[in-house]
Amino acid sequence: MTLSIHQNTSRAAGYRKSLEGWAKAGIRFVEVTDVMLDEFLKTDTVAAAKRVLTDLGLTPVSAAAVLPDIWIPGEARVASLDTWKRRCDQFSTIGLQKIYCPSITNRRVTAEDFKATPACIREAGDIARQFNLTAMIEFARTSTHLSTLRSTLTVIREAAHSNVRPMLDFFHFWSGMSKFEDLDMIRSGEIAHVHFQDILDTPRELMDNNGRVIPGDGAAPVVAILRKLAEKAYSGPLSVELFLMELQQGDPFEVASRITQKCEAVMRKAGVL
């Protein structure tokens, strides 16, 4: 597995400065976000965004497109699919092969919504395929739709779209309703991408994004989860996505250096580095 950093971790630095600081710290794999790219594009171009990556020797491994009603019928779906297509175009131009959207639904969801989910997945997958991208679903612990690994695997398998795969976020997995045993459901090579965090020893009912910490600083069984993912033939990026203000507003070089030291120790212990 390889270490990566998600741009949310250095959000205050902006698109260019976050990447420059990380590259200086030796990071080679990065995950970009729609919000930070949009800020960059206010004064520059998609081609320039790609040059920032290539000039720094960075490989973009995934990109976030946070949109409502991508994976479920809803009032925002038509507009979200238009934005999804634009994001696919932007991210493929930058050099990406993967795009993800989290399940951010917070309204009441019915059994009929779940029945319609595979068709929604196929439609989003068809758009991603036009740009040679793999679309990934990130289940989110607070979602009223896809909040667990089990549910996400079920609907993706039912959709059976070659360009749509599941991803796993350590925080949403361990702090939500999923169980460690659910990892046994994963088929060999099925997981396309991983967000890597540790989680504070806090009651799940009180947990928020501040409960995400650098791997090794929390109480989650991160080593055991890494070993299980390796058993399931995952060998891709471990993208560190954190929201602590001290990190988001910190110097990207120092933040990346700190993350690298701690994460590599955990990865070595798990035997995945």
Which ranges hold each PLM region?
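Active-site-proximal loop/turn and secondary-structure-junction residues that shape catalytic pockets
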Residues: 9-11, 34-36, 66-69, 103-107, ...
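Active-site acidic/histidine proton-transfer and metal-coordination neighborhood
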Residues: 16-17, 52-55, 72-165, 175, ...
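N-terminal substrate-binding region of glycoside hydrolase catalytic domains
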Residues: 21, 25-41, 64-69
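Catalytic-core regions built around general acid/base machinery
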Residues: 45-56, 120-127, 182, 225-228
